[in-house]
């Protein structure tokens, strides 16, 4: 039995890549051979440093992703697209029994329609280099059609009811909610009982314009004026093309004269992230409309009180008193979070157990078994593994 995992690149090391890694582990542990189709060769050391686990032994083959390919690779029993929010990957023989699409949020068709420059560049990296404008337009149309067919002709999984409603509205497809995997046990065990916390504020996000990190810098200006918090640490991974956006954020900090309040750390190691989590009392998420919010769950499991915008999937698990719509409300929510008792932190931490990697793997394996029948005997014979 062979399963083909499809993902643009695992080297971005964000929440979507964590899900792809857990999915690879879930399928491999069932005794099914796993092949990876991707545009960029995985940097196994970077992946290990980011997630504390290796997938090298789980992959039987790594092939170059070809979104023009019309049919599945020979002998492939099931295709799992773990990048279904961005990647229009469709084969003519796809159906709901041999194709699974994990769609964090159905954004690709919108990005194609509006001609988003970043997404257009991503499509060009896939197949458009050297094409004439007329051929590029034909390919954009083909990509749009492929995305729609992929969503309609596969079993679609998503991360929250917020995303489920968006998928139903856009494609008429009723997807199944499978929350993404989060290393809640690692963060809880390493950080929950920390006695070294101060009034510092933590932000975890990939440095990319789509993440709207400038929102937390605008909030930081008001927090500093109101003498709330000792510092704000903004940390996350950054690819080479993120330098321009990072410079913009740096200039914004200087414009607000927040150099002594806002600090950036890029591509930090996992142990450094744990150090910051042990010190922080409040986590702020910058993006309204976040489909789920893996970093929010990580922070909660570590005993950090989350403060999030009041639109998005994170509203399904963050208490209303820690949600905000305006920056003024954000200041009030941060003040409430800073004053939260230890019992509140423990309660929120333990509420995240349902999002554990173990639960994700178990539920994904059950879905795979139910729709394909390829793993029943293997699943019964092998225990659920942990990353």
Residue map of PLM features:
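Nucleotide-activated donor-binding/catalytic signature segment of Leloir-type glycosyltransferases, i.e.
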Residues: 246-268
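Short alpha-helical donor nucleotide-sugar binding micro-motif in glycosyltransferases
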Residues: 267, 275-280, 364
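Short hydrophobic beta-strand element within catalytic cores of glycosyltransferases
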Residues: 296, 305-308
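A charged, aromatic-enriched C-terminal amphipathic alpha-helix characteristic of glycosyltransferases
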Residues: 63-66, 342-387
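Membrane-proximal helix-turn-helix segments that form the acceptor-binding/catalytic region
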Residues: 119-156, 163-165
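A conserved mid-protein helix/loop that constitutes part of the nucleotide-sugar donor-binding site
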Residues: 18-22, 199, 208-222, 244-245
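Aromatic "clamp/platform" in nucleotide-sugar-dependent glycosyltransferases that forms part
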Residues: 288
């Amino acid at each position: 039995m062979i399963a083909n995992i499809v993902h643009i690149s695992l080297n971005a090391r964000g929440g979507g890549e964590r899900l792809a890694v857990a999915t690879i582990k879930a399928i491999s542990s069932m005794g099914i051979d796993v092949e990876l189709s991707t545009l960029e060769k995985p940097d196994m050391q970077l992946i290990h440093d980011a997630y504390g686990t290796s997938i090298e032994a789980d992959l039987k083959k790594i092939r170059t992703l070809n979104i023009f390919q019309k049919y599945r690779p020979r002998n492939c029993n099931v295709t799992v697209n773990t990048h279904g929010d961005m990647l229009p990957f469709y084969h003519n023989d796809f159906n709901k029994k041999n194709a699974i699409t994990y769609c964090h949020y159905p954004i690709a068709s919108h990005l194609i329609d509006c001609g988003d420059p970043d997404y257009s560049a991503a499509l060009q990296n896939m197949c458009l280099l050297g094409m004439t404008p007329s051929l590029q337009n034909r390919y954009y149309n083909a990509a749009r059609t492929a995305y729609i067919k992929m969503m309609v002709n596969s079993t679609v999984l998503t991360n929250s009811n917020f995303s489920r409603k968006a998928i139903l509205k856009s494609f008429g497809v009723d997807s199944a909610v499978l929350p993404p995997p989060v290393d809640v046990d690692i963060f809880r065990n390493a950080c929950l009982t920390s006695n070294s916390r101060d009034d510092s504020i933590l932000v975890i996000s990939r440095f990319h314009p789509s993440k709207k990190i400038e929102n937390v810098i605008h909030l930081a200006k008001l927090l500093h004026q109101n003498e709330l918090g000792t510092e704000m640490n903004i940390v996350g991974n950054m690819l080479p093309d993120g330098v321009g956006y990072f410079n913009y954020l740096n200039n914004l900090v200087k414009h607000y004269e927040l150099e002594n309040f806002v600090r950036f750390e890029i591509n930090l190691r996992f142990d450094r992230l744990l150090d910051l989590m042990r010190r922080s009392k409040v986590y702020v998420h910058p993006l309204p409309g976040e489909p789920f919010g893996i970093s929010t769950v990580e922070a909660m499991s570590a005993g950090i009180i989350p403060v999030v915008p009041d639109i998005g999937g994170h509203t399904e698990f963050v208490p209303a008193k820690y949600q905000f719509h305006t920056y003024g409300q954000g200041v009030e929510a941060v003040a409430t979070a800073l004053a939260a008792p230890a019992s509140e932190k423990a309660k929120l931490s333990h509420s995240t157990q349902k999002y554990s990697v173990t639960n994700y793997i178990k539920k994904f394996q059950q879905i795979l078994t139910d729709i394909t029948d390829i793993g029943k005997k293997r699943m019964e014979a092998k225990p659920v593994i942990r990353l």
